[in-house]
């Protein structure tokens, strides 16, 4: 298996507080890697560094053989290859479900409306949310919102999908539906990096647990 992402000697500090210290890890294409650890250990910061929502203090992030932190590398282009599912869904409240899943495709990937709609519907079907296309986020449960967020990320055709504790903001009865959705995506060719406290889930789906 070839590495799609290689992290070498990564460090991240906030002022005097060094959150990530000399992190080294590889993620192979199609692999499901789960990162576990105690609260405050820097798991979410690592994901945010991988997609450059946070700029690392030092080290390398190598994507398909090229260091994305080198001057001249196109960060917007790099970010189009990474999807991220956040704890707090981050849906657009003024848009319905379908619009949430098409707006990024049309704006960033320059797809036309019909193509974007077709791809969005395919992914909403995958996560069991196709019948809610006209609903606004306020009309959905937390679990439903997170499944829409997953469909939205998938609709951007990412090479790597990052999950930052996707069930931590959910009521216990809604956790299962999101984990089931993620389990169905695992080992379909999509590369997944997951931060979670769900240990049983991590054991079931992961190729590696870090």
Residue ranges and their predicted role:
Residues 3-210:
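ABC family nucleotide-binding domain
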